[in-house]
Amino acid sequence: STPTHADQLAYLGQWFYSYMRLSAPTTITCEEPAPFAVGTPILLGHSARRHKLVLNILVDALPWNIVRTHFSEWMPNIARFFSNGTIFDAHFSTSEYTYPALPAIETGRYAHHTQLFQADASHELSRAFLTLGECMKDLGYYTAAPILTTDSIYNGTMRGYDRLISTVWNQPSGIGAERAIHHIEAFGEADLFTFLHLSDIHPWDAMGFNFHTAVETHLPLDQRLFAWEKATASVRLPDFEIYKAQFRAGLRDVDRNIGTLLSYIENHYEDDEYIVSLYSDHGSSVFTPRRDEDPLDIIGENSTM
């Protein structure tokens, strides 16, 4: 009920959040003696001190030194968008895998400061380190990550975000782009800081998943079949052609789906109303040639650029 609106019953459903647009003090009660959660109000309105949209897109395991020479060919939609922006060609990750790399990105601190290295023997990020989400929230942005992994939540890296939608294992760009557009449509009356974590091109051990259908149907048999019987961490995967083909297939998905999102932004915002950054947390070992007996240089530029 509100001062100008009588009590009204409404069924809101279970196990999910509902949203209501409020313009006056409102009292919400439950007909049954059952607990319910009420989220922090989302304040609408824009400020000249902020941009209407700040969008960070993390394409997990994107080796820029490999992609750079094929950028306009492999990622034509994204390349067109950023042709009017700034492209960094000598930017390196602090780590070769996500768990320590993402906290470094979100805090601006090296891993030896955050002390976040391994999920099974870890802790919460020190409160002395402000995260990017906390800083943007303090500036008045409505902070959200419509798609991200779960491991960065428990260690405190995602502190400061008002809304998180996480999934385990897979964060496809098609779903991420759709959720981002829906998020903008829903909350675009506020100034938005939005983060997407996408895993389309992240390499995975062939013993644990199927390859892209287009990869399996186009590779010759000698490249489609390979002898590999030991479980291997993604940072140590060999340079098999099938892994490279899987990467390129995932990259096409990223370009097509994120290209749609970028076009949406261009059509709905003025040039000075938004900032978009696309980056990665580390590279990929599958582009590093080596013999079976050779050790892998996990801090080489293929893994960290």
List PLM regions with ranges.
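Catalytic domains that recognize anionic headgroups
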Residues: S1-M305
